[in-house]
């Protein structure tokens, strides 16, 4: 029988439509046509992007030239522009302000063909460190209230360029979905004097059936009330409110579980398009860090949001998270295939501190 499940953080209900239950092989494969031709993110084309605002490059090389490992530039076609004042104002009953913000692109690797999960853990750590540096810098601007970090992988997920990249957008408001999540966390904390994400980590670790993988610092799970098939959350086990406050050792552990989670998704689902979104605390006037807990949400693009979802806000998910977690645990990232590897629920294949071969 179908179930309605309530997300314990924001109170959102979803329908787990077991009558439509799907395993990975039941989903139609979304294949993005390979584009050929010029790529502005490839080494040698640095002059075709705005100047770099952050870079990890070989010592002695000049800015905006090749021989870099990670590169961050302003988006050539920004959603928000960094120049100007907010000029908040009313138009009758309506509110508006100038579209002030920042929009940056983090190029993950010089290699055009390498997807995020194929990067060595050390390279993913460089990417996460670059995210941290740029978020700290952008948060110094008093006009900005929130910094959204996200990745669109594949044309169906909104990617317009194939070369691996992450985007950062600083906004002058705290987006509604973030406010809903913060309010849900605060309500739980005021009621129980505990962080709800810490409670989720403790409960999921104890029952194990929705765990995808883990290490000493992070837990990767299929959430109890997922909006989408194989929606995956990566959550710090210790209470951490703000991503940009994370030390290098925590980021290294995060890199390992991120990589393994995406490897399992790619192997189980035949490399689907996906989005991942970083949820972290707002910047500037945000003071209370006791109740909010940063995390990453990964959403493979396997189904489409249609009229019922738009009209009601209820999502229909044909794959129970327990079945999704079990299937993701069956694949074997170490051997690069989808055969079961006998890994116990929640047991990582290898310590995250081990570096993969170059």
Predicted segments with their positions:
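HIT superfamily nucleotide-processing domains
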Residues: 1-358
């Amino acid at each position: 029988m179908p179930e309605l499940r309530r997300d314990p953080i924001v109170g959102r209900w979803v329908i787990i439509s077991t009558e439509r239950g799907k395993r990975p092989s039941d989903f139609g494969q979304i294949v993005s046509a390979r584009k050929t031709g010029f790529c502005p993110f490839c080494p040698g084309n640095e002059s075709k992007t705005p100047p770099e605002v952050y870079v990890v490059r070989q010592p002695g090389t000049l800015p905006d030239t090749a021989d870099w490992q990670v590169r961050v530039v302003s988006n050539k076609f920004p959603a928000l522009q960094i120049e100007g004042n907010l000029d908040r104002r009313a138009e009758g009953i309506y509110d508006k302000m100038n579209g002030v913000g920042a929009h940056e692109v983090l190029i993950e690797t010089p290699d055009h063909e390498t997807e995020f999960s194929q990067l060595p853990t050390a390279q993913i750590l460089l990417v996460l460190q670059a995210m941290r540096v740029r978020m700290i810098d952008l948060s110094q601007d008093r006009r900005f209230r929130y910094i959204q970090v996200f990745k669109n992988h594949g044309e169906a997920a909104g990617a317009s360029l194939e070369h691996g990249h992450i985007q950062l957008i600083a906004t002058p408001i705290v987006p509604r979905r973030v406010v809903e999540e913060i309010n849900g966390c605060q309500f739980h904390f005021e009621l129980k004097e505990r962080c709800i994400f810490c409670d989720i980590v403790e409960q999921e670790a104890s029952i194990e059936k929705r765990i995808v993988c883990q290490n000493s610092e992070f837990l990767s799970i299929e959430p109890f009330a997922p909006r989408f098939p194989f929606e995956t959350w990566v959550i710090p086990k210790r209470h951490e409110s703000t991503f940009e406050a994370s030390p290098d050792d925590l980021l290294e552990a995060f890199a390992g579980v991120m990589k393994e989670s995406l490897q399992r998704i790619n192997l189980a689902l035949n490399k689907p398009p996906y989005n991942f979104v970083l949820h972290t605390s707002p910047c500037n006037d945000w003071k209370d860090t006791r109740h909010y807990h940063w995390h990453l949400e990964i959403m493979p693009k396997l189904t489409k949001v249609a009229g019922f979802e738009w009209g009601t806000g209820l999502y229909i998910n044909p794959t129970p998270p327990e079945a999704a977690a079990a299937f993701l645990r069956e694949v074997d990232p170490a051997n690069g295939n989808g055969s079961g590897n006998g890994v116990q629920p929640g047991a990582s294949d290898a310590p995250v501190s081990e570096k993969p071969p170059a």
